[in-house]
Every structure is written in C-alpha cells, then in structure tokens.
C-alpha cells in the first residue's frame, strides 16, 4: 500500500509548469520532470501498521521532500530493488542480508542526535556489528505460552519443554531447527550464538531425548494448538501472543534467557536523500514519536526516553517486557554464519527429526 503526503502549494506549481497540451489532445510531462519529481519525493518502507498517518505527518515537518509511505506485510513483499527506498524499516534477519550484500549505508550518528535515547544494551548487535547500519525501533522475544489452568505458577523455564516428561504429549516446539537448537543452548547455560561443536552436539542429544514427549515440531501453529486444547505448552514470540483473546492462556519469559528480534531503521546506499533520511530516523527516535510506535504495536521500545513517558499499563505489561534480570540473558543473533556451521546445524536437525 502506498500513501503520499505532498505540499499542496508545490504540487499546484508543478501542475501549472510541468504539463503541456499536445495537438493530439494528450497531456504529457517532459522527461526531465520525471527525474525532478522523483528527486522531490522521499520513500519510506515499513511493515503495515508500523507508522501511523499522524507519524508520517510529523516526519513531513522535518524534511522538504514529499514523503511517500510504502508498506509491506512480509519480507517477501518488500521488493527492495524496485522501490527506491530512502529509509527502510525491517526485521533484523532481513536487514542483515542487505548489509552483507553491501546494500545498506553506514549511518552518520552525528546526524541522529536522538540516538542517545537508545538503551545502551542495544549499542551493539550480532547482526550489525558496532551498530553501524541500523537503529533499533522496536523489539520482542521468544518465550513460552501456556494454559494457565494446568499450572499452579507460570512455567518460567525451558526445562518443561526441553528436558522433562511431566507434560508429555502436550508440548509444541518450533519447526525451525536452528532457533530450537539455540534455545536448547540457552537452557544449557551457554550463548545461543556459540559455534562450538561440543555444545551443539549436547543440544542435539537433549532434543533427541525429548522428542518422545513432543506433540508437534512446528508442523502446526503452536498458539492454535494451545487454543484448541491440544497442547499445554508452546514456544511462541510475544509479538504473536498479543492477539490471543483466551484468558486461560498466559505468556512467560524463561529465566534462562532466549532470542530477541528487532525491527530497525536503515538507509539504503541507493538513497540520494542522505541528510533528509537521517532527519527522518532522528524524528522516529523523538520520544513522543517512539512512544507512539511502541504503544500502537504493543511491542517493547529500546528508547529510554519514550519508555519514561509511556503509559503505566504499557510499561508494566509483563508480556511485553521481561524483568531486568531476565532481559540480560536474552540475545540477538546473526543469520549469516559460516558454511560449516550451517551444514552442521542442518545435519543435526535432520538427525533429530529422523530419530
């Protein structure tokens, strides 16, 4: 979906000077005007519902170009090469691929003074070393969804899903072998980004032992299985949990830690509006704008000043925010690793499924 916000005065002037009437009765624009008009438009790409019309209007105040808002529903719909993005908001796993391909520019942090509002925990990342290319706007985490009536207290440990037969036949795991192995690594007390074969072999053994107790390995949606009463425990992202309307289903962050995902802003190298693009990102980090994004999405904000002025109900939502001790054990991850590691994970996952 494309939304355009243009200054009426400028548009009228273009209309008067840029169009000519030909003898055939067809109105055409000179070729030079196409280039001129493109140069006066700044394209922002974002997930659907990420940026409200009001926010786009706020951004318009800090640039002279007309803003063209392009939204997408999934990474496969971004169409990076054809949309001439000046600012792009995307999930970390997708942006890492663009960074690796050399398509994302390094940011000039001097042009983004509001970057000082970002929690220091996010100043580095596994997918963007030294945070040279991206600015985090929103984040969430993988945790445990459970049926409350089956538990006397929240099952806040991976043990019940990965290392116990107490809930045999009532557990839904992920169908993503790499993420599941990373979660097993966190349960064992090591970094989910380790590539040490010894630890990864231990994770494989753990999952093989537990397989007999698992109802589903990602073939079905874990939340749907919970709602239908087929399982009592499932691995889900808190982003997906927020739309559940069943009061008997809860969400908890495991104390061992887990995986964090981030939605970030960046500037493609193809942008010719570098300064204005930096101004847009800086405006996104304005506390009021950042607060609006976070409360609208009901996902966590890494912006300390935005959190400070947010509603109490948002700040105290335990589905959005883990407590301070647990969040320290959460990690982001890189999806681009060496070939040997990828082959090892793929082979181990096949072994787990075939066991």
PLM feature spans:
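N-terminal secretory signal peptides
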Residues: 1-10, 24
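A ligand-binding cleft/hinge motif common to bilobed small-molecule-binding domains
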Residues: 94-99, 227-228, 233-248
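Early extracytoplasmic/lumenal segment of secretory-pathway proteins
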Residues: 35-97
């Amino acid at each position: 979906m494309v939304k355009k916000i243009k200054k009426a005065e400028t548009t009228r002037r273009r209309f008067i000077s840029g169009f000519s009437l030909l003898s055939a009765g067809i109105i055409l624009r000179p070729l030079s005007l196409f280039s001129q008009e493109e140069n006066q438009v700044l394209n922002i790409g974002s997930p659907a519902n990420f940026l409200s019309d009001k926010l786009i209007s706020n951004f318009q105040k800090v640039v002279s170009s007309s803003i063209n808002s392009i939204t997408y529903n999934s990474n496969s719909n971004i169409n990076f090469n054809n949309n001439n993005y000046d600012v792009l908001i995307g999930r970390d796993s997708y942006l890492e691929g663009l960074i690796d391909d050399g398509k994302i520019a390094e940011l000039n942090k001097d042009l983004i003074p509001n970057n000082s509002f970002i929690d220091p925990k996010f100043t580095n990342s596994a997918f963007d070393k030294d945070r040279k290319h991206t600015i985090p706007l929103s984040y969430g985490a993988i945790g445990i969804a459970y049926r409350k009536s089956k538990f006397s207290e929240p099952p806040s440990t991976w043990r019940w899903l990965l290392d116990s037969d107490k809930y045999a036949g009532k557990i839904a795991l992920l169908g993503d072998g790499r993420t599941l192995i990373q979660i097993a690594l966190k349960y064992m007390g090591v970094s989910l980004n380790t590539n040490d074969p010894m630890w990864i072999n231990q994770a494989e053994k753990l999952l093989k032992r537990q397989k007999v107790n698992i109802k589903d390995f990602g073939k079905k949606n874990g939340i749907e299985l919970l709602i239908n009463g087929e399982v009592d425990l499932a691995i889900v992202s808190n982003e997906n949990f927020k739309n559940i309307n069943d009061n008997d289903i809860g969400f908890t962050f495991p104390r061992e830690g887990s995986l964090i995902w981030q939605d970030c802003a960046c500037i493609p190298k193809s942008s010719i509006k570098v300064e204005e693009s930096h101004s847009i990102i800086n405006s996104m980090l304005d506390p009021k704008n950042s607060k609006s994004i976070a409360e609208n999405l009901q996902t966590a904000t890494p912006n300390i000043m935005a959190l400070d002025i947010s509603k109490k109900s948002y700040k105290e939502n335990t589905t959005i925010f883990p407590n301070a001790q647990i969040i320290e054990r959460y990690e982001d991850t890189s999806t681009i690793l060496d070939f040997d590691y990828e082959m090892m994970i793929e082979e181990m996952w096949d072994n787990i499924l075939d066991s």
